[in-house]
Swiss-Prot record:
Associated pathway: Protein modification; protein ubiquitination
Function: Substrate recognition component of a SCF (SKP1-CUL1-F-box protein) E3 ubiquitin-protein ligase complex which mediates the ubiquitination and subsequent proteasomal degradation of target proteins. Acts as a positive regulator of the BMP signaling pathway. Required for dorsal/ventral pattern formation.
Summary of subunit composition and partner proteins: Part of the SCF (SKP1-CUL1-F-box) E3 ubiquitin-protein ligase complex SCF(FBXL15).
Protein name, per record: F-box/LRR-repeat protein 15
Organism: Salmo salar (Atlantic salmon)
Predominant localisation class: cytoplasm
Keywords: Cytoplasm, Leucine-rich repeat, Repeat, Ubl conjugation pathway
GO process terms (BP): bone mineralization; dorsal/ventral pattern formation; G2/M transition of mitotic cell cycle; positive regulation of BMP signaling pathway; protein ubiquitination; SCF-dependent proteasomal ubiquitin-dependent protein catabolic process
Taxonomic classification: Eukaryota, Metazoa, Chordata, Craniata, Vertebrata
Amino acid sequence: MDAETECCKCHLLDLPWEDVLVTHIFCYLPLRQLVRLQRVSKQFYALIQVYLANCRTFDLTQIGPSLPKEAFCNILRDNKVLQNLSVQNCSDWVTDTELLPVIGQNQHLLRVDMRGCDRLTRHSLVAVSLSCTHLQYLGLAHCEWVDSLSIRSLADHCGGLRSIDLTACRQLKDEAICYLSKKCLKMRSLSVAVNANITDVSVEEVAKNCRELEQLDLTGCLRVRNDSIRTVAEYCPKLQSLKVNHCHNVTESSLDPLRKRNVEIDVEPPLQRALVLLQDVVGFAPFINLQI
């Protein structure tokens, strides 16, 4: 009986690698655990390399910020089928040297997140533009190296872009945003927050060209006024969210029509703000010295 049981034993590595382990098992395990599994044996190392070569998503938030650049390059060395790439957690060390080879051999990327990667240059963005023509989402928040020329390249080659985060990309001016909106007509989500260069000119152009727009973030765009918000209300019937906090020239007269359409706005109506202030004053009332 023991001999028969021994013959019937099936070890993990005996299962078909690509058809079973890679496709139906490893896809449910965190990347951190899979990387650790490589250390068990040479066979496990080879197996995990097969998995990594067929991985559709690479997100470093699953591993942590401590991944060395050598490990990053090794993990993605053989992968040519990535669809989602996030290097946000590599911001301390990732440069064009590490990223360009990955971009160059993965032409099916749909989502790329480079937020906060301040050691990259425009060469990485141009590479994304030229290689990833089916790109739908791009995160570039706090990448101050993003300039007008690289955005033009993106607009020319990635017309199907649905969402882009340009928060604090302070080199960009109205001209670049206008050009982007004319080329990427399917845009549904756009952030140009924390950029004092943005004015009504580009906001109105976005509204008129991107009729499918659902989310617009103008936080801290100090030169944006009521006129462009009215244009957004007129041309963007699918708008769901508008952020205008710290836009001091945007008032309730332009926001009220959007509120009536149940658009989520991050600024409270004047009455609500007054009630909050009143509650604060009442809260301090016991401490007020009435003899003053």
